[in-house]
Amino acid sequence: MKLCRFAPAGGAVALGIVEGEEIVDLSPVDVPAEPAAALDEVGQEALERLAERAPRLGLSDAQLLAPATPHKYLGIALNYADHIAEMGMEAPEVPVFFNKQVTCVVGPGADIHMPRVSTFLDYEAELAVVIGKRCRHVPVEQAPEVIAGYTAANDVSVRDWQGRAQTMTIGKSFDTHGPLGPWLVTADELGDPQDLRIRCFVDDDLRQDASTGEMVFDCFQQVSHLSEAFTLEPGDVIATGTPAGVGIGRQPIRDNLLHVGDTVRVEIEGIGELVNTVVEEPEGFVAQSLPAC
């Protein structure tokens, strides 16, 4: 099942089920608009029954929004061997996580802002895990039971701000620098999350091309590790790392970073495309509250 958050023309944010080129509109029924919460509170089978008599609209007639509204957005660094090599670093012995502030989240088609304070803007294609159950101390073998599904992420990074801080959070958390989408694919439909092709294009230039099977720490290990420290909640997002090919890993670096007008396309097998375009940061921009993004 592919679940989305969307806003029909002139309408409020609603939950939808994507089927081909249509959205099954679940706004007439009393279900959460957030996919992970709907799966947790209503259940997938009940959503399928509700969809049988729900109205439909075309994908092109709705604005797709980020398919998760996380309380916590976490990312892992240095989780593909080829990316570790291109950065000239050594593989970590334990997962290295950082926070992305949730006000960075935007959906498919939204603009990525070139900050007024930097032009060292970079892309990172990533598979994102969306948590589906409130959980703590999850064994690796039980991690699939607490995952609602998966989506595509672009862990947009401001490299100079990232590099001069003791933690990566500030360089990873600028407003609009957390695109997610286009929808959440439930775990049962996606299958093995460690056997997916992941690619990133800047305009039509292929920059990243790898398999999620190349992760150092797989999705289930990441969920388990984080849950040892703190409670994970439905809708929380874990960006599971990026492969080689990021702009800062290419020469000349300046030419391979993002520029105003560039369109970034993250493609993940079994999920789809997440497309966003870089624009100048608008004067006076303030991020919307998360449910509206």
What residue spans do the PLM features occupy?
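Structural signature of FAD isoalloxazine-binding scaffolds in flavoprotein oxidoreductases
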Residues: 90-108, 123, 259-270
